[in-house]
Amino acid sequence: MILKSQQVRSLSPEMDPLRMGMGWTVDDLSKPQIMVESTYGNSHPGSGHLNIFVEEAVRGVNDHGGKAARYFATDMCDGMAQGHDGINYSLAHREAITNLVEAQANATTFDGGVFISSCDKAMPAMLMSIGRMKDMMAAIVVTGGVMEAYDLPAKYTENDPGCAINELLTLEQIGKFSAQYERGEIPAEQLTYYKQHACPSCGACSFMGTASTMQVMAEALGLMLPGTALMPATAPELKQAAYDAGAQLMKLVEAGVTAGDIVDMRSFENAIMVHAAISGSTNALMHVPAIAHEFGFEIDADTFDRMHRGAHYLLNIRPAGDWPAQYFYYAGGVPRIMEEIKSMLHLDAKTVTGKTLGENLEELKKNGFYEHCDALLAEKSKKIGREIKRTDIIRSFDEPIGTNGSIAILRGNLAPEGCVIKHTACPKAMFKATLTARPFDCEEDAIDAILHGRIHPGDAVFIRYEGPRGSGMPEMFYTGEAICSDPTLASSVALITDGRFSGASRGPVIGHVSPEAAAGGPIALVEEGDIIELDVEARRLEITGVKGEHKTPEEMDAILAERKANWKGFTSKYTHGLLKLYSQHAVSAMKGAYME
């Protein structure tokens, strides 16, 4: 087999001296050239430690006959971008990273790549770039794991100081505590203490948000070594996993196996079934279709809805559950989930080990993986002074938390192309509700109304012009937390938007409303006092009346048509730069919100 790197080398006589200018030896030039791409940088805790794993992967490659080159595409942090216009760049920067990695890989041809990241947009961006290069190189993914939870002193535990779960502080709680402070419910000193200890280590945030979900998706797609997603970032096993990934990549290069030889539609269907079992972030409904698109497959939100129906939901991890995300690994991680739901998986799907998914699961049972996880869980039990069973974290298939997956796609005259709700994080009281519309054209106005008592039980808070072609589809996390942290609103008010939500979001929050307001979707036509009907089980979201008076479907159609005729249209505020490009070229959120 003639390596692609050697073919290009013969076409570019400057390549050899340029590489030797960085310390390559003459012998290095003829070795398989491997790209070790990461999002390392001081942008946030999910990327600030990745250089450790970069060096391990480089060593794994070099020790097994390759020559590794370090490349970087530092990502932004959605958490740091919350609450200001920086969050508008979030989805656009997924596209920017994908484009940068594609350019880096093609400008200097490589034979394989190790792709290392941790968080919300970096994980899908890496997977999208692998899809673009699916027939060009071998690929394997390493994640930066998950941060630790902080053990709070008893005086800071909420509600019950004896409850070990509440003593474990994780970042997604800060939005709630901030809203409590704004309402005068906790002092500034207490909020400061929470902030000081919410991120006690590097790694992805310790809840099943978008970062954790996408780490799990990478393993479920077969692109990671089994059992390596969501390891604690400080665990020595993660360093070993990075080294092993570099070594395994060299086997794939030698065998001529590319990512396109591994990932197929079975891989994506497996990932979606795992998503249902873990109650994964709703943002995966944009990321997985975007990744599939790059691999040449078409998946949309309806695929998720269909596969989630009847799926067993097993994972008791925050924000929908009780435990921090680090406990997922202690309970057996992705392999344990797959073992429980294997009757619903394609066990013949290929993976980067060179074996099928089914073969990987059998090997893990033989090599002591689960015993190792059990020992870690026992150690954690001892530390917090409470026995934790594996089934406290990952239920068995026969005793699930629920049997209808975790998300639903709703439709109706308000969302003809659909919208998404994470029903596992929604109070049952809100599964069927009649609400009064309270529309806002930006998140800041909505938050102000909530925090100052202008939103009441039975209201439906609308935030619009926040879709891909509007403001770039930012997260509405703070608005959701402002509602959920208020006991009078948490089970009586819905939040509906053409924007999206953080993976940490909880409560009756409905996002990705399509068509979006900027495209003239019905959400742009909602007026104060409209009657909104929500029915999760029937998958319906409708405008059924105006000013408190119900209308027939035909009457509502006529009213909406008249409003549309008077709609003044939308003019983007972005006149240059990345957000102009993204807002002009992004497809619907229901398709993946990628640029075309």
Which ranges hold each PLM region?
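Glycine-/small-residue-enriched capping loops at alpha/beta junctions
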Residues: 49
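Acidic/charged coordination and interface sites in well-structured regions
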Residues: 52
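Catalytic or ion-coupling anion/metal-binding cores of large enzyme and transporter domains
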Residues: 1-46, 55-73, 79, 85-90, ...
